[in-house]
Amino acid sequence: MPRSRTNGNFIDKTFSIVANILLRVIPTTSGEKEAFTYYRDGMSAQSEGNYAEALQNYYEAMRLEIDPYDRSYILYNIGLIHTSNGEHTKALEYYFRALERNPFLPQAFNNMAVICHYRGEQAIQQGDSEIAEAWFDQAAEYWKQAIALTPGNYIEAHNWLKITRRFE
């Protein structure tokens, strides 16, 4: 039985019902429907913290999904899981791949910036200010891109850019 039919969360159940109705009404191929089912089940598993199961579903969705825009969200969610697992290099790779397919994902730019900022902080703790500055500069570039896509969002990042004089 698909995960979406077993989930007890009201919001997830509502989403599943609406998604199932849309899948019946909107003309799509069986492959697209199957890809969406895996994606939906991946989101459900991810929201419950079942990352291994979520990754399996996302990889299946990637195998079936042909639309670059839809693939970008699958890749983004895979990046989120790697971020949660502390696998920052993998996370950066998946965010980058998502942005290759959809350059209008400010949340991917933001998450990449957060990882770079974290690495800058780590470099400071290790006494390497030159490496730290390089990571902070990269974080600034990613945050600028996120802010450009969604002005008014990422207020803390915007303030950090001003305070550190990285905002142009």
UniProtKB/Swiss-Prot annotation:
It is found in: Plastid, Chloroplast thylakoid membrane. It comes from Solanum bulbocastanum (Wild potato). Coiled coil: none annotated. Keywords: Chloroplast, Membrane, Photosynthesis, Plastid, Repeat, Thylakoid, TPR repeat. Essential for the assembly of the photosystem I (PSI) complex. May act as a chaperone-like factor to guide the assembly of the PSI subunits. Gene3D superfamilies: Tetratricopeptide repeat domain (1.25.40.10). One of its GO terms (biological process) is photosynthesis. TPR repeats lie at residues 35-68, 72-105, 120-153. InterPro entries: PSI_Ycf3_assembly (IPR022818), TPR-like_helical_dom_sf (IPR011990), TPR_rpt (IPR019734), Ycf3/AcsC/BcsC/TPR_MFPF (IPR051685). Belongs to the Ycf3 family. It comes from the Eukaryota. The keyword Nuclease does not apply. It is a peripheral membrane protein. HAMAP family: Ycf3. The keyword Protein biosynthesis does not apply. This is Photosystem I assembly protein Ycf3. Its main location: plastid.
